[in-house]
Amino acid sequence: MLLRTPTGRDNPMPTQLLMLPPQSEKTREWGTRLAAALPELDFIVAEDREQATEALAHAEAAFGTIPPDLLRHAQRLRWLQAPQAAPPAGYYYPELIAHPVAITNFREIYNDHIGAHVMAFVLAFARGLHHYIPQQLRREWKKLPQDAGVIHLPEATALVVGVGGIGSEVARLAAAFGMRVIGVDERRRDVPPGVAELHRGDELDALLPTADFVILTVPHTPETEGFMNRTRFQEMKKTGFFINIGRGLTTSLDDLVDALRAGEIAGAGLDVYEQEPLPADHPLWTTPGVLLTPHTAGYGPYLDERRYEIILDNCRRFLAGQPLRNLVDKARWF
């Protein structure tokens, strides 16, 4: 479907942006809204691969996922908006990385929702809910000793691994509860509000033993795959808690289960997993001290409107020749 303004001698052919398949009611709506807001652009909503292949010969910009066999038709493509904040494994491949196309993503739209989810895990562990929830299911009235099962947050340290938008929001919220926040980030050099110390990635192993909560927010990249393993869990405090809301492939679940059952860490809160859905027979389901949510940390209001605003902003920047928002380092996948 082509959403186009009339052309003529005084109105030359506009730049084309292709909405790659598959389409949804939302992407079709975006195409209509963008066409009304930006008459300088043609918006082509491709319903199938045949339409996408034909349109790619002329499109200078696109939204969605482009597989290798379609990429070879994209001779004019200069900008690709990824459909996620952190696209899944396989989105970036050698031919796409080598292609001159610039890629942007939807990072920043989930910061407040995921930040709140992380603090839900932190507060649950700090107040011993990982002990009391199983007791509730057993209808068992049993209090932990008054001085046990509680972490006084103003005396606790949170180690936030990955201090981008989400990590920065986690740091701000944790600091508001009085926690001392240490950040680890490969790229960031400015220290965001709430972070007491900011370190490089090669300092992580030395910092793990200092943290009461290790909070992983990093994306899945070649460098972070299997990032949290048995060795790193053993470096944590035995009273420490691990939280992962980044990407599942960054953490070895077998190693996590072994560490939990060996008493090497006190508990774990997970929203992402190596395999999703998490298989019903996975030992993580029955491992004590674990809180699991089914990849819902980013759920919340306003997400679709935030996505649209980023696309609209980047369309305007693209037309004006300005730097694009949320530009990705393709070789590093984020």
What are the language-model segments listed below?
Residues 83, 102-109, 202, 246:
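Short beta->alpha connector loops at strand-helix junctions that form conserved
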Residues 3, 8-104, 229-231:
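An N-terminal-biased, well-structured beta-alpha scaffold segment characteristic
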